[in-house]
Amino acid sequence: MFVSRLAASGLLLLSLLALSLDGKPLPQRQPHHIQPMEQKWLAPDAPPLEQKWLAPDAPPLEQKWLAPAAPPLEQKWLAPDAPPMEQKWLAPDAPPMEQKWLAPDAPPMEQKWLAPDAPPMEQKWLAPDAAPLEQKWLAPDAPPMEQKWLAPDAPPMEQKWQPQIPSLMEQRQLSSGGTTALRQELSPRAEAASGPAVVGGGGGGGGGSKAALALPKPPKAKGAAAATSRLMRDLRPDGKQASQKWGRLVDHDHDHHHHHHPGSSVGGGGGGGGGGARRLKGLAKKGVAKGCFGLKLDRIGSMSGLGC
């Protein structure tokens, strides 16, 4: 009984407290309770590291510095008595974006500008008393993108250019000289290959049987002459035109040789008694062979007796 009354009184007190606090705003902090590190203003008695304002005769976004009592490393402006390492301006006779350097007493390694007689993007160097390895420009007689080197006294390993290439006419002259030398080397070999065939055809006066046995020798000379003709035909592209002209002359000489000298065809086997006649018939059956440069050959295996 006593406990229930005590609990009911406690609940009544809590409800009254809740009704009294309902609808009231929370207490706000007063301005005098703000800490010093959270307060920023432009008062004259502020610490130098926390005080910033603008000059009275300069735009707000262009000039900023600290109080006069601030150290020089934290103070920046364009005054004429500023340190040379922190002072930068442009020359009076140069565009603002192309020419920048430090004070007149700055070291040469920190002073850069462009030459007055060169484009801004192609020629750059340092002060006149700078080291030669730090000075670069282009040659006056070369394109800007192909030839670059340093000062005139620079080592040759830092100078690059393109070597000279022989022209197309010189290459053709070299190739034609090699072809002429090869042709002169092959011509004596062709004459040596056709020589034994000429000698073997005229010395058969002993008898018909020996002349008949000596008949299979000309095909060897003909094969050597044909092999030489293929090599020479590759070297001379106008072989077909020359072969047609020489073919007509050889046919004319061959007919003239048989009509005007009837004894020459039988003279090879003169003492043999009919051996030369069989030899002439064998050559007539086979026909006239072809040899040097695709031309026709006579019975002794040479072109009208001249050889290849």
Swiss-Prot record:
Cited InterPro entries: Natr_peptide, Natr_peptide_CS, Natriuretic_peptide_brain
Superkingdom per UniProt: Eukaryota
GO molecular function term, any single one: peptidase inhibitor activity
Pfam families, per database record: ANP (PF00212)
One of the GO BP terms on file: vasodilation
Its biological purpose: pEKW and poly-His-poly-Gly peptides may serve as metalloproteinase inhibitors during glandular storage. Their inhibition may be instantly disengaged, by dilution or physiochemical change, when venom is injected into tissue of the prey.
Signal peptide as annotated in the record: 1-23
Gly residues: compositionally biased ranges: 198-209, 265-277
Compartments, as annotated in UniProt: Secreted
List of residues that carry Pyrrolidone carboxylic acid: Q39, Q51, Q63, Q75, Q87, Q99, Q111, Q123, Q135, Q147, Q159
Keyword Disulfide bond: yes
Protein name: Snake venom metalloprotease inhibitor 02D01
Cystine pairings recorded for this chain: C292-C308
Comp. bias (Polar residues): 172-182
Keyword Signal: yes
Species annotation: Echis ocellatus (Ocellated saw-scaled viper)
Propeptide boundaries: 24-38, 42-50, 54-62, 66-74, 78-86, 90-98, 102-110, 114-122, 126-134, 138-146, 150-158, 162-249, 278-286
UniProt keyword terms in alphabetical order: Cleavage on pair of basic residues, Disulfide bond, Hypotensive agent, Metalloenzyme inhibitor, Metalloprotease inhibitor, Protease inhibitor, Pyrrolidone carboxylic acid, Repeat, Secreted, Signal, Toxin, Vasoactive, Vasodilator
Biased amino acid composition, Low complexity: 210-227
Entry's family note: In the C-terminal section; belongs to the natriuretic peptide family.
